[in-house]
């Protein structure tokens, strides 16, 4: 009896990485510079200047009619419409992929608005879709943080797995004298190591084989995820490498509570069975009871004394990530004013207290009309006043003014034939959605993440 072993499906698994916006394009450039193998790179941007300088072999100009190559102006709704305009081009570029990584910086215009649209298209092609995005620094301001929260919420609906990198944690990791380029490289390494690790898993010859079907089992429809790679050598190399792999300080989630874990150990010919057991025990203990570990090992003589541990953990209850998404949007409540008016006033004091409260109410309303954040839900009258007043703050020369006024409805896109309500949170009146377009210093820049823009020169 003859047996035929067909390994073509495994060896020919196609992985594509698409960088969206300025930060996404920078991440793609970094991966190309680092020599990541086994994947195809795509850059998508509304900014033609940034797109022309990108090193990806496939480039997509998003919304050429809408933005004329000048960027999204830090407005997510513009990035969204630009991606919808270029839907067919995006679909053609993504076809044929088994796995698609979408990377972007959340908080700006193109990355925040276009990434969810691209993720939806990617899922419709049948590919395993993974999002790897950054949350902005706190010092970038509340408006950008709020935009990021909205973009992440949209993206979650269309990706199988989502990895969120917290830029704020770069401040805790690097020395004060660390150059900015080196600091951002640490964030890019999360994506690079994850992509390279998965590529290596499905193309290498293993003693205990892992293939693309295993990757799909762990990552399909799983939500928040952790991706990490650890390297170590010496006596306790496997233990140290495994601990490094499961404790990436930049990620918003931990492995605790993971339901699915893909664990692969690569070492030289001297890799022992007990070392493999040590790695599995560490992961199992960190993840908790009920975790399903899919385990693999491979031998690479070129590693010498070094071992490489790759961990992909999914099905995580992302409470920490949810808290992180809410944190930038918090604002002080009004306890101070309430403490003033709560005490029982005397008859002689009553008119003055009432007058003070009235003046304070006026000040609060005026302050809220120029705020970049939605007012708290405990003051419904202030929220209504803010909405009414914001129309007067729109830049009268802005091409988006008329469009924005007309689009205070569930869907922001008029020419969409179907699924019109799927990308509506960028224009809704809900306090959690993005506020109306306001004139700000961000409008002077076409870069999605201004703190990333200098990285184009490397």
Swiss-Prot record:
Keywords in alphabetical order: Cell cycle, Cell division, Cytoplasm, GTP-binding, Nucleotide-binding, Septation
GO BP terms, alphabetized: division septum assembly; FtsZ-dependent cytokinesis; protein polymerization
Basic and acidic residues compositional bias, start-end: 401-418
Principal location listed in the UniProt entry: cytoplasm
Superkingdom field: Bacteria
Gene Ontology molecular-function annotations: GTP binding; GTPase activity
CDD domains in the cross-refs: FtsZ_type1
Any Pfam family hit: Tubulin
Name assigned to this protein: Cell division protein FtsZ
Family: Belongs to the FtsZ family.
Function comment: Essential cell division protein that forms a contractile ring structure (Z ring) at the future cell division site. The regulation of the ring assembly controls the timing and the location of cell division. One of the functions of the FtsZ ring is to recruit other cell division proteins to the septum to produce a new cell wall between the dividing cells. Binds GTP and shows GTPase activity.
SUPFAM superfamilies the UniProt entry points to: Tubulin C-terminal domain-like (SSF55307), Tubulin nucleotide-binding domain-like (SSF52490)
Residues covered by region (Disordered): 319-458
Composition bias, Polar residues: 368-379
Name of the gene encoding the protein in the UniProt record: ftsZ
Keyword match Transmembrane: no
SMART domains hit by this protein: Tubulin (SM00864), Tubulin_C (SM00865)
Localization (cell): Cytoplasm
GO CC, alphabetical: cell division site; cytoplasm
Source species of the chain: Lactobacillus johnsonii (strain CNCM I-12250 / La1 / NCC 533)
InterPro entries, per the entry: Cell_div_FtsZ, Cell_div_FtsZ_CS, FtsZ/CetZ, FtsZ_C, Tub_FtsZ_C, Tubulin/FtsZ-like_C, Tubulin/FtsZ_2-layer-sand-dom, Tubulin/FtsZ_GTPase_sf
Biased composition (Low complexity): 425-439
Upper taxonomic lineage: Bacteria, Bacillati, Bacillota, Bacilli, Lactobacillales
Subunit structure of this chain's protein: Homodimer. Polymerizes to form a dynamic ring structure in a strictly GTP-dependent manner. Interacts directly with several other division proteins.
Binding site for GTP: 22-26, 109-111, 140, 144, 188
